[in-house]
Amino acid sequence: ERTHTGEKPFECPECHKRFTRDHHLKTHMRLHTGEKPYHCSHCDRQFVQVANLRRHLRVHTGERPYACELCAAK
């Protein structure tokens, strides 16, 4: 696979950054187009990547998934 060969055949036509996978290029292109297809159902925030929306949703749910290793606080 391309992961270990360093091959990056997918190039951004705007900034010429290269990617190993076509879907990485498609996600990157949203930075140039301003497209933000992932919308928060609780507020007006919009996101380029679904992972950023999932992280943002914790603001509304109060979820704090990472505990401190020293004091067990989240």
UniProtKB/Swiss-Prot annotation:
User: What protein name applies here?
Assistant: Protein krueppel
**Which biological processes are named by the entry's GO terms?**
segmentation
Q: What's its job?
A: Krueppel is a gap class segmentation protein.
Q: Which SMART domains match?
A: ZnF_C2H2
Span of the secretion signal? none
Segments passing through the bilayer: none
The keyword Zinc belongs to this UniProt entry's keyword annotation: yes
Q: What is its main location?
A: nucleus
Determine the domain of life of the protein's source: Eukaryota
According to the UniProt record, one GO cellular component term is: nucleus
Taxon lineage:
Eukaryota, Metazoa, Ecdysozoa, Arthropoda, Hexapoda
Q: Which UniProt keywords apply?
A: Developmental protein, DNA-binding, Gap protein, Metal-binding, Nucleus, Repeat, Zinc, Zinc-finger
Task: Extract one GO molecular function annotation from the record.
Answer: DNA binding
